Structure formats: C-alpha cells, structure tokens
Design a protein with these regions (language model features):
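Generic protein-terminus/edge-of-domain signal
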Residues: 1-35
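Short beta-strand segments in beta-sandwich/barrel cores
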Residues: 27, 34-39, 52-53, 61
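A cytosolic small-molecule/anion-sensing beta-strand core signal
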Residues: 32-33, 48-49, 67
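Short acidic-glycine-tyrosine-enriched beta hairpin
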Residues: 42-57
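Ligand-binding loop in jelly-roll beta-barrel domains
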Residues: 59-90
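An amphipathic alpha-helical interaction segment
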Residues: 93-149
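A short, Lys/Arg-enriched amphipathic alpha-helix from helix-turn-helix/homeodomain DNA-binding modules
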Residues: 137-173, 195, 199-200
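Short alpha-helical "recognition helix" segments of helix-turn-helix
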Residues: 174-183
Length: 202
C-alpha cells in the first residue's frame, strides 16, 4: 500500500549501495548513527549523524549506507499537491521537526497518533530551504581513489574500496582482476572482507 506520507525507521547492518535512479517521492532522510553518502551528479555528500537531507521527487541520485547505519526517512507522495522544495540538499530542521521525527520512531505505524504527527511533519517540511554544502568529510570522499592515502578512517577506506569492487564486478570485471587491482592479489582477504562488509560474497 502506498500512503501519501510514510515514516521509515531503517537499520543497515551491512554495506548497502543503491543504484542511481530518479526518486519517485519527496524524501527527508536523517542519519541517527553511522554514515550515509548520497551521489548527485558527480559529487558525493556525506550525511553524518544528526544531519537531515532533502531528496525531491525526480532527483537523480544514488545512496550508500555504511555498515551499522541507522536512519529515519519520511516519504511524501507525488499525489500531494503541496509546494515541496525542488532542490536537493541539507536542511536545518526546526526544533519541532526534530522532536516530531524522534517521536515518530517510537510511535506505532499507521496509528492515529502517527498520522497526526506526519501531517505536522508535512507542514514543517514545506518551510525548509535545502542547500548543498561540502563538508570536510565529503571533500575527502570525493578525492578518494583506491590505494591512495586519503585522510579518512581505515574503516571508511575499506568500505569505499569494497564499494569500488562491487562497481567493477557490475561492470563485468573478473574477480581475479578486482582482487589484483584492489587487494594486491590477496583473494582470501577479499573474500573475508566481502562477508564482513556486505554479509555475502560479491
């Protein structure tokens, strides 16, 4: 069932990489813990804990959720005739909007209380002004290349390397080529890391 407004409380125990596609709904994404990365055009933006990001309907993007990431998301159907922001970007949530999202996470799905809260969320969202800003982490992620000594944590470097391995696999590269290019020919390490980060073999 597709509702006009929906709230999702999602956990990603493993690396989750979504294909680039146009958004079918307007979405407000907030990261509770972990890290999400959204790619718009050729730029990637890190969405860190406590940050809120607006994705308008029709926006071409791809989302990456790092392992152990917890997010809240409100989706608004195109059936709604309200004037939602058409620009993707970070938003500074009002105190009320933050409180509403926190309350929604503890409220029974599709209950009368949740529906009332979602109606107020919609009114708050209609007043947002999204803008794109490059944080220090976003800049490092955009500059990162396999094997380079970027100023990022070992964990993030590992996740970005495995995301690159997945991309190579999808483009038709053989496993032996991926292992040689990204893991110095160490097949055992590659297989172990795939299970650790993806929860399965690539």
């Amino acid at each position: 069932m597709n509702y006009a407004i929906e709230f999702h409380d999602a956990n990603y125990p493993f690396l989750n990489v979504a294909a680039r596609k146009k958004s079918l709904k307007h979405s407000l994404l907030s990261v509770v813990s972990g890290l999400a990365i959204i790619k718009l055009g050729k730029q990637e933006y890190a969405i860190e804990p406590g940050q809120y990001f607006w994705i308008p309907q029709g926006c071409l993007s791809s989302l990456t959720f790092l392992p152990n990431t917890h997010v809240h998301r409100c989706d608004f159907s195109v059936r709604l005739n309200d004037a939602f922001a058409q620009q993707a970007g970070f938003i500074k949530p009002s105190i009320l909007l933050k409180a509403l999202i926190e309350k929604l996470a503890k409220t029974e799905t599709r209950s009368d209380i949740q529906l009332d809260l979602l109606a107020v969320v919609k009114h708050e969202v209609l007043a947002i002004s999204p803008n794109l800003s490059n944080s220090a982490l976003s800049q490092v992620i955009n500059q990162w290349k396999p094997g380079c000594e970027a100023r990022i944590s070992r964990e993030l470097c590992l996740v970005l390397t495995l995301r690159e391995a997945r991309k190579m696999k999808l483009s038709g590269k053989k496993e032996s080529q991926i292992v040689e290019h990204l893991f110095a020919g160490n097949t055992e390490e590659y297989e172990q890391l795939c299970f650790l980060v993806f929860g399965e073999a690539l």
